[in-house]
């Protein structure tokens, strides 16, 4: 769930996620590798340190939910969401920065996910993302989120209807 500042007492955006994973051991890592410093959730047995949710020193935060109905190609090498989020935390300060980041990534991106992002300036959006494109869902859009929040699980609204997982949630 991502919540805009208009729906919180403090007037700041908020993100809340849970983690569906088969990795039983996780930890919060501190990253200072050039760019913005950040904290990120990583699988403890992952030597590469893919980040599955995190926040950086500017107030930019990111998470994802897997999508199972948005992929529209036959590319086999996938599951780069954690690497994408690690890079985004290093270089993004705002929701607009994240959009530019996605625009400039080489294709295929090797992802099928809904990335939730918030920033310290009130930005709050989901990006339904596959190998070639993304669809932005802005939680500040009163037509889309009249109460100031969006809830996602393991499917994308722009994806194939009644395919995938997560509809019962």
Language-model regions, residue ranges each:
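Intrinsically disordered, low-complexity linker/loop segments enriched in Gly/Pro
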Residues: 81-109
């Amino acid at each position: 769930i991502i919540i805009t500042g208009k729906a919180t007492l403090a007037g700041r955006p908020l993100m809340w996620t849970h983690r569906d994973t088969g990795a039983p051991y996780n930890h919060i890592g501190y990253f200072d590798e050039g760019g913005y410093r950040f904290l990120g959730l990583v699988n403890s047995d992952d030597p590469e340190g893919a980040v599955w949710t995190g926040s950086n020193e500017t107030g930019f935060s990111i998470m994802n939910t897997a999508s199972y109905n948005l992929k529209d190609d036959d590319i086999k090498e996938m599951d780069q969401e954690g690497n994408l989020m690690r890079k985004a935390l290093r270089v993004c300060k705002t929701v607009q920065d994240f959009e530019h980041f996605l625009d400039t990534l080489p294709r295929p991106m090797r992802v099928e996910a809904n990335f939730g992002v918030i920033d310290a300036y009130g930005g709050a959006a989901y990006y339904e993302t596959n190998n070639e494109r993304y669809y932005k869902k802005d939680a500040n859009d009163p037509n889309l989120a009249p109460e100031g929040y969006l809830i996602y699980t393991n499917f994308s609204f722009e994806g194939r209807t009644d395919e995938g997982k997560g509809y019962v949630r």
